[in-house]
Curated annotation (Swiss-Prot):
Lineage per the UniProt record: Bacteria, Pseudomonadati, Pseudomonadota, Alphaproteobacteria, Hyphomicrobiales
GO molecular function annotations of the record: ATP binding; ATP hydrolysis activity; ATP-dependent DNA damage sensor activity; damaged DNA binding; single-stranded DNA binding
GO cellular component, one term: cytosol
Main location as per UniProt: cytoplasm
Protein name, as recorded: Protein RecA
Amino acid sequence: MDKSKALEAALSQIERSFGKGSIMKLGAKDSVVEIETVSTGSLGLDIALGIGGLPKGRIIEIYGPESSGKTTLALQTIAEAQKKGGICGFVDAEHALDPVYARKLGVDLENLLISQPDTGEQALEITDTLVRSGAIDILVIDSVAALVPRAEIEGEMGDSLPGMQARLMSQALRKLTASISKSNCMVIFINQIRMKIGVMFGSPETTTGGNALKFYASVRLDIRRIGSVKEREEVVGNQTRVKVVKNKMAPPFKQVEFDIMYGEGVSKTGELIDLGVKAGIVEKSGAWFSYNSQRLGQGRENAKLFLRENPELLREIETALRQNAGLIADRFLENGGPESDGDEAADM
């Protein structure tokens, strides 16, 4: 009994000092908050993440080689949030955002806040101010590699300033992490890959900006281009693989494959075919795809074309997939993602 009285006294003192709700039992009914998520624009990736999308109030890192689809994935997430009335911001440290492409992905440019800062300190100060406002749902920083410290910009070309960017990121994340959680704002950091020199064993790849982001991120996505999508001889898109390298919300290390079409973003038709086959909703016999005894086409690209021309059927398959999402998730995650019909795509 002495322990329980001492605990009650300590809890009441904490609540008097820091306010009601500053400490509570995790299982208490009023303390458990459902995690809000935002879709990535890819149903397969939403399933692989285990919670139906990317979590709000958390730090997300998307990294990969050049032209792998990092910014596309971030912009699609912004478009999905805007569809639900969310306010989004984009800190364009690379000064390379293409508004025409963003609009094609479904981003509402009139309601997208954009900043093109001069230095890393300015970018992170803007990020901190927007997060603390509590009015932003998603904030994208593109990219960590472009967050150049002021001292480096003002210095001479060739000056050696080791660890300065890592210290900048570490300090910023220490400040940001609490306000991100309180404001329920999702902050997506896009990052690039560098090679470590002299690595004999293991992967020589690393991300820029030091180790702080790896620790603070709740979800880390590794996105890679694994092939091309062709129509006859013309390349019209990339086959992309995303691996959930870190996930604090659900089991990690799941991976998913989908097509990113040039000027369109993630190919929902191709992805729904892959997921439908995996779940047994779409039948595949040889090269033919069919749904409810109706033939969709011979080869994956022809099936995609048929579904694009028949949006009602596409919606029907998507609804069936969403209704069976739990069953799909189990089978899908066990097998590590939808099968890639790269050979068929290349033959079309």
